[in-house]
């Protein structure tokens, strides 16, 4: 018999925060007999998943990429958001070699600089201040033709909140005396991550060919027209602003999203040789720059190269001869693999992965259970087989259904999670295994904006639950953060903590 319980399952309930407020709280409204029993029976507490505790600016809500990086690294990982913001403040951004090389080449040839990005203050995939800085950089370096192709948010921000961001950029271009917003579309089209190429195709043709479904004299007018059509920010259809603009050979294109997962598909359409996901009417040869590295396989320079993380949990388990399973449905598969492994695509030795397809629905309020039951089937099977020392699972429901803003669907999502967690803990009891239950950030515990009365579709800064489900006597240390979770797993496995992991165990065995 092994010295420590096996398997140890880390259950990450994506978007499942804790709030004492019952109003518009899908967790409070749901029937959760399993969650209630676990909290009544086992050591539990709350840990932080936002702000500087996860390497983000103070007061910045956490997100799935950041959360999983911290969970897997066992140390606070200073995020690309923070790196870029600091570089702008310090002035280093304006000396960035990758961006300047592309811009200077375009300027020397009398060509345009196109800026792509999610125009919002959400801070999850991008930040509007970074886009302003990019416009300033292009103007400083002599670009006369500067075009912003703005993707609208409404997901990490309220559903109809884009106008102040548009006005901020209009004012920035006016101040610079050059540049303008050339197109608008919702992130639903430009930032897909599930191979829904028909959406990406519309965004690509809008940017490259100036082919929009609608045209407006100004970006604000284009936005208002979309609202009148019943479209919120996320779903704004392809709209050209003023005289339509095309991307030409020799232009520079800088994609200002710092988060990789929703920037990859559109980037591939621009730069991938032999791209075949849809027919490109034109494929201009441009100087394309990614703000960060969206994937090692994408043939384009990154302004901010990835910072290597060593001895992350997956790597350290492999070094110690332990086996691990990573499992999630499509929406969160990258998080439980690439991001949890510190930005590494390949599995470690002894690591196996299971990808369960996410349901093919337009929005997940239409199927709030998503693929959680199928994910759970595979986990229960893995527990019963006792093939793995560690199982790491992400359940997407709280986040993905929370993002829809549909309260009744969010309640159903929480109830689905409760059932699934019950099945896992029951299977673990039969084999003597243990579990840690936590989340990466909040979302589903706040489904309405108290100030505006609109649906609250964004993440929150609320703490997240942490439960140790095991037979060993233990207490929970207060003041924990996501970076403390990996050291906690090592403690429960009886493994020493590597020096690179600066987090501290949350579960103190008695």
UniProtKB/Swiss-Prot annotation:
EC number(s) on file: 5.4.2.12
Covalent S-S links between cysteines: none
Residue sites binding Mn(2+) 2 per the record: 14, 64, 440-441
A GO MF label: manganese ion binding
Assigned GO CC terms: cytosol
Binding site for substrate: 125, 155-156, 187, 193, 259-262, 332
Keywords from the named record: Glycolysis, Isomerase, Manganese, Metal-binding
Transmembrane segments: none
Pathway(s) per entry: Carbohydrate degradation; glycolysis; pyruvate from D-glyceraldehyde 3-phosphate: step 3/5
Subunit structure and binding partners: Monomer.
Purpose of the protein: Catalyzes the interconversion of 2-phosphoglycerate and 3-phosphoglycerate.
Protein name (record): 2,3-bisphosphoglycerate-independent phosphoglycerate mutase
Natural source organism: Ectopseudomonas mendocina (strain ymp)
Gene: gpmI
């Amino acid at each position: 018999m092994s010295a420590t319980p096996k398997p140890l399952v880390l259950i990450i309930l994506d978007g499942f925060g804790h709030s004492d407020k019952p109003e518009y709280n899908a967790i409070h409204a749901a029937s959760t007999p399993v969650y209630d029993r676990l909290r009544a029976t086992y050591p539990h507490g709350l840990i932080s998943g936002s702000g500087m505790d996860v390497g983000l600016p103070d007061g910045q809500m956490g997100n799935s990429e950041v959360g999983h990086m911290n969970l897997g690294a066992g140390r606070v990982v200073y995020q690309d958001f923070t790196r870029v913001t600091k570089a702008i403040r310090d002035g280093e951004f304006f000396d960035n070699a990758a961006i300047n090389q592309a811009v200077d080449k375009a300027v020397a040839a009398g060509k345009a600089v196109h800026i792509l990005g999610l125009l919002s203050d959400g801070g999850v995939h991008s930040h509007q201040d970074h886009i302003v800085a990019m416009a300033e950089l292009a103007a400083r370096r002599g670009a006369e033709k500067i075009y912003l192709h703005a993707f609208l948010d409404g997901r990490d921000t309220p559903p109809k909140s884009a106008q102040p961001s548009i006005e901020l950029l209009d004012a920035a271009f006016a101040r610079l005396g050059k540049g303008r917003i050339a197109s608008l579309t919702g992130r639903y089209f430009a930032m897909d991550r599930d191979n829904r190429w028909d959406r990406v195709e519309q965004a690509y043709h809008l940017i490259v060919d100036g082919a929009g479904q609608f045209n407006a004299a100004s970006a604000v007018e284009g936005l208002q027209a979309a609202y009148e059509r019943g479209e919120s920010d996320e779903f704004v259809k392809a709209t050209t602003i003023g005289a339509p603009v095309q991307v030409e050979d020799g232009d520079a294109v800088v994609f200002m999203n710092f988060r990789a997962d929703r920037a990859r598909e559109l980037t591939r359409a621009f730069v991938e040789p032999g791209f075949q996901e849809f027919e490109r009417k034109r494929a201009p040869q441009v100087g394309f720059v990614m703000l960060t590295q969206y994937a090692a396989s994408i043939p384009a320079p990154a302004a901010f190269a990835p910072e290597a993380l060593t001895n992350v949990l997956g790597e350290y388990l492999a070094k110690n001869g332990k086996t691990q399973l990573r499992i999630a449905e499509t929406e969160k598969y990258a998080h439980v693999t690439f991001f949890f492994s510190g930005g590494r695509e390949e599995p470690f030795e002894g690591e196996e992965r299971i990808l369960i397809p996410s349901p093919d629905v337009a929005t997940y309020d239409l199927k709030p259970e998503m693929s959680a039951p199928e994910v759970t089937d595979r986990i229960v099977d893995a527990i019963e087989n006792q093939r793995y020392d560690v199982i790491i699972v992400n359940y997407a429901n709280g986040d993905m259904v929370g993002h829809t803003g549909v309260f009744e669907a969010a309640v159903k999502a929480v109830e689905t999670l409760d059932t699934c967690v019950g099945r896992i803990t029951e299977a673990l009891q039969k084999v003597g295994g243990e579990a840690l239950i936590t989340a990466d950030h909040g979302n589903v515990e706040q489904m309405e904006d108290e100030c505006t009365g609109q649906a609250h579709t964004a993440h929150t800064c609320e703490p997240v639950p942490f439960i140790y489900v095991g037979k060993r006597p233990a207490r929970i240390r207060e003041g924990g953060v996501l970076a403390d979770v990996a050291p906690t797993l090592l403690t429960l496995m009886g493994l020493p903590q590597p020096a690179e992991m600066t987090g501290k165990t949350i579960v103190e065995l008695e």
